[in-house]
Regions:
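Short, small-residue-biased leader/transition segments that mark boundaries at the very start
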Residues: 1-7
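Glycine-rich phosphate-binding loops at beta-strand->alpha-helix junctions
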Residues: 13-14, 153-177, 188-189
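Glycine-rich phosphate-binding loop of actin/hexokinase-like ATP-binding domains
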Residues: 26-87, 184
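Conserved phosphate-binding/catalytic loops in two-lobed NTP-binding clefts
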Residues: 27, 175-194
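Conserved ATP-utilizing enzyme core subdomain
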Residues: 75, 82, 86-124
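Glycine-rich phosphate-binding/hydrolytic loop that grips phosphoryl groups
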Residues: 78-82, 185-206
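Adenine-nucleotide phosphate-binding core of ATP-dependent small-molecule kinases
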Residues: 116-149, 189
């Protein structure tokens, strides 16, 4: 194509549904490219979206050195948090703020959405504070994510992308688990799309 606007990149879960794209690239590769563009010092990308969570380790050039995904169930994803918010009759903005000032360090023992929901209902019946329950949920997701980071050999600096990066309580809890501060761009939700656009620009310039 002769113009950048004429190049179409496909990435993510819907990439196979688009038949007229110029090239198909995995979202792992696109997230790595986008993250490196936003901050070249980043060596580990934590992406928690609606359908999956993934941790990607980058080399100094922004190429994928290693990665691990959780895409088998909703556990540890944005969908998990959405369902827990619905159970607690709160929206995601409220959930983001809740848990920041918890008093009781509650532990949610199951990451299975069905069993975790039962635990939350039981905690509500016990008149546990909302902030404490939300912190327990944040801690469960953060622990699972930190375990993924350990598996992939995560190293600083860490960047968090995806819609869940807007959840203040979860970000704080994850930072505590990792022992470091997460880099979060105001374009965190667009990181994969940004990477795809950069690959498209490369095609145009060749």
């Amino acid at each position: 194509s002769s113009a950048a606007s004429d190049v179409y990149k496909r990435q993510g879960y819907g990439r196979t549904a688009i038949t007229d794209g110029d090239k198909s690239i995995t979202e792992i590769t696109c997230h790595a490219r986008g993250a490196h563009f936003l901050n070249p010092e980043v060596r580990t990308v934590i992406d928690i979206g609606g359908q999956d969570s993934k941790v990607i380790r980058l080399d100094e050039n922004g190429a994928v050195a290693n990665f691990v995904m959780n895409d088998k169930c909703a556990a540890g994803t944005g969908r998990f948090l959405e369902m827990m918010a619905r159970t607690m009759e709160m929206d995601l903005d409220q959930m983001s703020e809740a848990g920041l000032t918890y008093k009781e360090d509650i532990t949610i023992s199951s990451m299975c959405t069905v069993f975790a929901e039962s635990e939350v209902v039981s905690l509500i019946a016990q008149n546990k504070e909302t902030d404490d329950i939300v912190h327990g949920l944040n801690k469960a997701v953060a622990s699972k994510t930190a375990a993924l980071a350990k598996r992939v050999g995560g190293e600083e600096r860490y960047m968090m992308t995806g819609g869940v990066s807007k959840n203040k309580g979860l970000v704080k809890t994850l930072e505590e688990k990792l022992g470091t501060t997460l880099v979060i761009s105001d374009k965190a939700q667009l990181c994969g799309a940004l990477g795809a656009a950069l690959f498209a620009m490369d095609m145009v310039q060749k």
